[in-house]
Curated annotation (Swiss-Prot):
Chain positions recorded as heme b binding sites: 63, 92
GO cellular component entries: blood microparticle; haptoglobin-hemoglobin complex; hemoglobin complex
Species name: Panthera leo
Name by which UniProt lists this protein: Hemoglobin subunit beta-1
Tissue-specificity statement: Red blood cells.
Length: 146
């Protein structure tokens, strides 16, 4: 496994306290605000005209919730991320043609949101473990490009 037993413990320990629905909406919203070019995949989502509009957009929140619930399911299969994300990789890569760089950006935004929510608890060791996880997930999602 790309994570040690200790790292898995840190990731699962923090993740058990995450409000997945709320954090998902915030992470996707921040992605669209911070990296505005990612908005082109969400043109059907309505008003994305300002940071406030994006962060309060119900469709953004709903998709963010969906995204993070999938991420959460993936954590249960941490030793087979490629398998866990095969279908989503196919959808995003083959059908939607999402640039895989966007998966990496969202992973980094998620790390920021977790740091923001958990403060001191999100210490350097926890961050290091989560960076490995989001990199692993991004790589699994980009798998169809290789």
């Amino acid at each position: 496994s790309f994570l040690s037993a200790e790292e898995k413990g840190l990731v699962n320990g923090l993740w058990s306290k995450v409000n997945v629905d709320e954090v998902g909406g915030e992470a996707l919203g921040r992605l669209l605000v911070v990296y505005p070019w990612t908005q082109r995949f969400f043109q059907s989502f309505g008003d994305l005209s300002s940071a406030d509009a994006i962060m309060s957009n119900a469709k953004v929140k709903a998709h963010g919730k969906k995204v993070l619930n999938s991420f959460s399911d993936g954590l249960k299969n941490i030793d087979d991320l490629k398998g866990a994300f095969a279908k989503l990789s196919e959808l995003h890569c083959d059908k939607l043609h999402v640039d895989p760089e966007n998966f990496r950006l969202l992973g980094n935004v998620l790390v920021c949101v977790l740091a923001h929510h958990f403060g001191h608890e999100f210490n350097p060791q926890v961050q290091a473990a989560f960076q490995k996880v989001v990199a692993g997930v991004a790589s699994a999602l980009a798998h169809r490009y290789h």
